[in-house]
Amino acid sequence: MKKYLFLFVTVVSLALFSGRAHAQRYLPGMKGVELRGGFANGSKSPLNYYTGFAVSGYTPKANRWVIGAEYLMKNYGYRNASVPRAQFTAEGGYYLKFLSDPTKMVFLSVGGSALAGYETVNWGDRMLYDGSTLLAKDAFVYGGAITLELEAYLTDRIVLLAGIRERVLWGSSLDLFTTQFGLGVKFIIH
């Protein structure tokens, strides 16, 4: 009996102390809610920023789809004032995981998204404070984005996001391209 008890204790000890177990991540069907924000075209003054939220889901091949919405504010200097351009866009995209560490704590993905939304310049007011008239008009915009995103798992359910994205939107009377640098947090809900 002592021999079996000793064998049992040895096996259990080896099982408990032989290595560290990690939670499984990027499983098919897992879903998360993302909150993100950052700078648009650098952090020049006046401040250009974006903020957004998204829902993402993981596929059987450890990739993910993303559906979300975003608000982008970019200011253009005019004399000693700024003229704001705001974009409200919806996004639908797919991200491919191409790199991860052995512990499955850090993942690097590249993705493409389709974007569509509305852009307003100076909140629809075409007359500036000095009597000048803006030629830029409010418009519907459409296009896409390419994103490089790093996901770092802080816990099994909380993920820190860092990304760089290049947006291209047609229909705008101002810039065609916008570069974004940002951070975010994702909460795994399923």
Positions of PLM-derived features:
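Extracellular loop and loop/strand-boundary signature of outer-membrane beta-barrel proteins
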Residues: G38-N41, Y76-V83, D130-A136, V168-S172
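Residues that define the transmembrane beta-barrel architecture of outer-membrane proteins
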Residues: G29-K31, S45-T51, S82-A90, V106, ...
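Cleavable N-terminal export/targeting peptides
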Residues: M1-G29, H190
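Membrane-embedded beta-strands of outer-membrane beta-barrel proteins
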Residues: T51-V55, A90-Y94, I146-L148, A152, ...
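Gram-negative (and chloroplast) outer-membrane scaffold detector with strong preference
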Residues: A54-Y129, F187-H190
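Predominantly the C-terminal beta-signal and adjacent terminal strand-loop region
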Residues: L72-K74, E149-H190
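Extended low-complexity acidic/polar segments
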Residues: W123-G163, F187
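Short glycine/proline- and aromatic-enriched beta-strand/turn motifs that initiate or cap beta-hairpins
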Residues: A21-K74, K186-H190
